[in-house]
């Protein structure tokens, strides 16, 4: 029915321990896989390639749940493709994480009472490399614990010699093509880290600020502006108003006095100004605000910096040497003394950027930096998606992608750090500027020096899909494995990393995008949907859950929550539930082996099979097709759910249970069912393997005697279906489910046997009577049988004799009491929900709780009423 890829093997061992203990097997299995080279990729292979790069984790850290989530998805994809016969490369590596790594090492130096300046640049960089060699192995160890099937021999680091050559090469090409330039512009500046930082390193949060309105000018020619940053007024070079604002037309083009200074500044008309906001007039500080800088460029305004790199006021009279916050208060006080405060401080909540590393408030600062001219690069990145060369999953994320690449500003790529790829530009004594490519000798002689800045980390990670394959050399690996098949990453870095890879890949690789597909996932959150944060106290170390429940349990939990582009809540209870699933697989396979399940020989002809056998094989092939379709659409949650319910419900809870009487009876039917059970388990374990690799490896090799499920063949849908068998077993399931529900309603113990008469004459269900009786604990009816309850289900009648088993009068009394309680609960809930005054004051969660009580009361009333109707008269 489905192919088993293994050649005939020696009879497998049927011995499995009574319990599955992940800690005893996971580490050994992983090292065995690595030693046998299963995860390595051969560039000379004639197999079709399948390539995925790991989003390189920062060398500074350890894997968090977000990494574990992402790695689980990538691992599932690559394991499946390997089983499908692809030459599969999952490219591992780490990012040098410039500012983060430098901060970590600087803190270590601080404990020794030293700074990086005490060491000097060269010695400090050596110290960082030493730290990297001592700390970098932590992430690799965690990846092994998780089961990542990466090609370890190809592991890369963004500061490796080969990757450094790639960085220098593309910088030189972009520079020569006039796509890299140096200019003075506004950047995000961290006064603590003393560097420009990228947009992604800025965290915005609402801060409680104070809005102050102040009067500029003298006499009849005054204008009022409002600001939360009074300290920057020392650098104002204009006041801007909207050109159509009648209130200020008489002032446009005139000079007005700038308070606290000896300067006068012009009033300019600019359409950027919103005449409806505040007074309709805004102060313009081109050196300390990105929007003001743009206004300044349009009107030829000078840019006056009033703060140094530490955000301290520079040469401006009495405020010189004051921190920006100290100066803010001092300037407001000075303005008040001159009678220029029109409105005192008012509370004002506004979004303020903070450095993601040190949480310091970002200072927009005019600075000479290196930039990438992104216009043509961004257009190519947008067109690649528009033209269908690259697909984004889920498709609705395409709009966000276009919104960004179509409105992209030039990218500041220089950082005032020591750790990173140093900018390959030299300056000469006469103002010469020379960009040096790989293999070229830099200028020498008196007065020549290299730019002291390093490149933004995202610059080198933007080359990751091809630099890891040996570019700029035309290697066999580059020819075989570029472009990547898919990029799996979070939607949060769609703009910052994904788009940069698109721009650089298309530019460096002659218009070939770095990947065919971008599969975006959401963020991992706690079980209440709250963002995981140290400040919230809800951060989970994935190693803790792997130690407690096993790696498979964590992986399966993460995969079951992975809907494309949607955030993933996760709680420990869910991981424990996945561990229960692993135990269920283990116990069911152990039972099957103990009862002779086998994969030896071909499957018997369908004519020799029972309807139960044909049903499970029909369902198996449907699930194979279903899982394949979900994989192709990156629907990890749906494929995991499909496998969970098929394995647990259909195979273990129904097929195995329905087949027990067949096994006990022996004979040809039992032998056929043993072979069918072996086939179903073989295929199910192979289907489950990409998501839960460890437990499936142990069980599959024990069941089949095969070398490893890692290199087994991925199951294919044979096309076998039996709709009749599926309908028949669905009817059996309905009968069993309904009688079980009745037994539970009547308070019968699960193991309590009850006399019963099954009217199955002429029904296809007659063949299942033994199994039905065994599963429902039904005895033969006997001579004294009295039908006290009759259940018609799906054309079958089940009569039960509950005489002496249930005190019907007492049971009716108990149910009547429960019904009265449920009706009272319903009345109370309805009364509260009908009270408008209560609803107006009650918190939403209280109202929701009462609605839940009402729904529960309705369910109880329906259930108890049905039980009373079925209960025989005493």
Curated annotation (Swiss-Prot):
CDD domains: Anticodon_Ia_Val, ValRS_core. ValRS has two distinct active sites: one for aminoacylation and one for editing. The misactivated threonine is translocated from the active site to the editing site. It comes from Streptomyces coelicolor (strain ATCC BAA-471 / A3(2) / M145). Belongs to the class-I aminoacyl-tRNA synthetase family. ValS type 1 subfamily. PROSITE patterns: AA_TRNA_LIGASE_I (PS00178). One of its GO terms (biological process) is valyl-tRNA aminoacylation. A motif ('KMSKS' region) lies at residues 531-535. SUPFAM superfamilies: Anticodon-binding domain of a subclass of class I aminoacyl-tRNA synthetases, Nucleotidylyl transferase, tRNA-binding arm, ValRS/IleRS/LeuRS editing domain. A motif ('HIGH' region) lies at residues 57-67. HAMAP family: Val_tRNA_synth_type1. Its EC number is 6.1.1.9. This is Valine--tRNA ligase. Pfam families: Anticodon_1, tRNA-synt_1, Val_tRNA-synt_C.
């Amino acid at each position: 029915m489905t192919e088993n890829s293994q050649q005939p093997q020696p009879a497998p061992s049927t011995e499995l321990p009574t319990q599955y203990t992940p800690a005893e097997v996971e580490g050994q299995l992983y090292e065995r896989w690595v030693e046998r080279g299963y995860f390595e990729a051969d560039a000379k292979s004639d197999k079709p390639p399948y390539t995925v790069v790991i989003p390189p984790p920062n060398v500074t850290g350890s894997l968090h749940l977000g990494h574990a989530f992402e790695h689980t998805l990538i691992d599932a994809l690559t394991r499946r493709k390997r089983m499908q016969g692809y030459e599969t490369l999952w490219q591992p590596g780490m990012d040098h994480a410039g500012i983060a790594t430098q901060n970590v090492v600087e803190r270590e130096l601080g404990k020794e009472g030293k700074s990086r300046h005490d060491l000097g640049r060269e010695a400090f960089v050596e110290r960082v490399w030493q730290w990297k060699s001592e700390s970098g192995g932590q992430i690799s160890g965690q990846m092994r614990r998780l089961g990542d099937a990466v090609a370890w021999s190809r592991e890369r680091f963004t500061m490796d010699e080969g990757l450094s050559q790639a960085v220098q090469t593309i910088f030189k090409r972009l520079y020569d093509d006039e796509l890299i330039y140096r200019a003075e512009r506004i950047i995000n500046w961290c006064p603590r880290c003393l560097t420009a930082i990228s947009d992604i390193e800025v965290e915005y949060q609402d801060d409680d600020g104070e809005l102050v309105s102040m009067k500029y000018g003298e006499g009849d020619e005054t204008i009022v502006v409002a600001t939360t940053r009074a300290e920057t007024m020392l650098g104002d070079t204009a006041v801007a108003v909207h050109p159509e604002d009648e209130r200020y037309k008489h002032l446009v083009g005139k000079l007005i006095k700038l308070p606290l200074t000896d300067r006068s500044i012009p009033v300019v008309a600019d359409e950027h100004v919103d005449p409806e906001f505040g007074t309709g007039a805004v102060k313009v500080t081109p050196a300390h605000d990105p929007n003001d800088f743009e206004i300044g460029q349009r009107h030829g305004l000078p840019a006056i910096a009033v703060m140094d790199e530490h955000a301290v006021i520079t040469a401006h009279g009495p405020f010189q040497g004051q921190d920006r916050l100290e100066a803010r208060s001092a300037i407001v006080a000075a303005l008040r003394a001159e009678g220029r405060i029109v409105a005192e401080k008012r509370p004002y909540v506004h979004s303020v950027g903070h450095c993601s590393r040190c949480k310091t408030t970002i200072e927009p600062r005019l600075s000479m930096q290196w930039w990438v001219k992104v216009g043509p690069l961004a257009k190519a990145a947008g067109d690649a998606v528009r033209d269908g060369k690259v697909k984004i999953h889920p498709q609705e994320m395409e709009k966000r992608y276009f919104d960004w690449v179509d409105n992209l500003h030039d990218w500041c790529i220089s950082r005032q750090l020591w750790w990173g790829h140093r900018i390959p530009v030299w300056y000469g004594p006469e103002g010469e500027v020379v960009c040096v490519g790989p293999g070229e000798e830099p200028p020498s002689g008196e007065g020549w020096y290299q730019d002291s800045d390093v490149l933004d980390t995202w610059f080198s990670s933007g080359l990751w899909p091809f630099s890891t394959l040996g570019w700029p050399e035309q290697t066999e690996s580059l020819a075989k494995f570029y472009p990547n098949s898919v990029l799996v990453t979070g939607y949060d870095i769609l703009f910052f990393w994904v788009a940069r890879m698109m721009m650089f890949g298309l530019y460096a690789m002659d218009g070939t995008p770095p990947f065919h597909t971008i599969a975006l996932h959401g963020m991992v959150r706690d079980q209440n949907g709250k963002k995981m944060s140290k400040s919230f106290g809800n951060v989970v170390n994935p190693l803790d859950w792997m130690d407690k429940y096993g790696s498979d349990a964590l992986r399966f939990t993460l995969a079951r929550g992975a809907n494309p582009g949607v955030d993933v809540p996760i709680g420990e209870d869910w991981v424990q539930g996945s561990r229960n699933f692993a135990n269920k697989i283990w116990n069911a396979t152990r039972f099957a082996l103990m009862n002779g399940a086998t994969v030896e020989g071909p499957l018997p002809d369908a004519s020799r099979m029972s309807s139960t056998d044909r049903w499970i094989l029909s369902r198996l092939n449907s699930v194979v097709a279903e899982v394949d379709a979900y994989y192709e659409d990156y629907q990890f949650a749906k494929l995991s759910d499909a496998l969970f319910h098929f394995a647990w419900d259909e195979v273990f809870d129904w097929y195995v249970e329905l087949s027990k009487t067949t096994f006990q009876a022996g004979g040809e039917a039992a032998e056929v069912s043993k072979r069918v059970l072996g086939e179903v388990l073989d295929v199910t374990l192979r289907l489950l393997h990409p998501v839960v690799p460890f437990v499936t490896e142990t069980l599959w090799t024990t069941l089949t005697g095969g070398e490893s499920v890692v290199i087994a063949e991925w199951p294919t849908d044979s096309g076998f279906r039996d709709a009749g068998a599926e309908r028949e077993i669905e009817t059996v399931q309905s009968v069993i489910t309904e009688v079980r529900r009745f037994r539970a309603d009547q308070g019968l113990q699960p193991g309590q046997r009850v006399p019963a008469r099954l009217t199955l004459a002429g029904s296809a269900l007659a063949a299942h009577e033994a199994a039905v009786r065994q599963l429902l604990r039904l005895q033969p009816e006997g001579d004294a049988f009295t039908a006290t309850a009759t259940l018609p289900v799906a054309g079958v009648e089940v009569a039960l004799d509950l005489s002496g088993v249930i005190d019907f009068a007492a049971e009716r009394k108990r149910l009547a009491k429960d019904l009265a309680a449920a009706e009272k609960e319903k009345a109370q809930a309805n009364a509260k929900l009908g009270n408008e005054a209560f609803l107006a004051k009650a918190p939403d969660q209280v109202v929701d709780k009462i609605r839940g009580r009402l729904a529960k009361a309705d369910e109880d009333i329906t259930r108890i009423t049905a039980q009373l109707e079925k209960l025989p008269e005493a």
